[in-house]
Amino acid sequence: RKEYLLFQKTLLNNNCNNYYLNILNLNKIDNLIKKIKPDFIFHLAAQPFVLKGYKYPKWTYDTNVTGTLNILEAIKKNKIKTSIIVTTDKVYKNDERKKSFTETDQLGGDDPYSSSKHICEILVKNYNDIYFKNTNINVVTVRAGNVIGGGDRGKNRLIPDFFKTKKEMYI
């Protein structure tokens, strides 16, 4: 995997373990959690491309929604005390304003990617209200925007597209 090369170059692989598996396979997720007994889960797995969501809506919903549901089930079954589920700033209703969103702004993803991530937030709220209330299990969501990582060479991605232009940037 090309994206794994950056992970190795930064030597992060010397300080932590990294596992690749299919987010749709609950049994593999559950078996891995039983094996490694993590202190926390940091869930970033996703189909992260807005435009691919239009082209492949079922894959987008399966990966993002069912994948998150599988993580929540594994958290519940294995009683993982702390978990962070990463969603996106795309969950906000895009009203074309020229200012940053706030936590209290209206939600409303209008495409498969955005709405799938909004559904993930609803799932986390439901699990917190139904299954994790009055327990020591804490699951939160965070909304990230324009996440970049090793191997991110996708089309129509802000940061990779900027570097492809090979122009100077003034700040």
Model-inferred region functions:
Residues 118, 135, 148-161, 168-171:
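Glycine/proline-rich active-site loop of Rossmann-fold NAD(P)-dependent oxidoreductases
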Residues 123-126, 161, 165:
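Generic recognition of well-ordered alpha-helical segments
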Residues 1-150:
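N-terminal Rossmann-like NAD(P)+-binding domain of SDR-like oxidoreductases, especially those catalyzing
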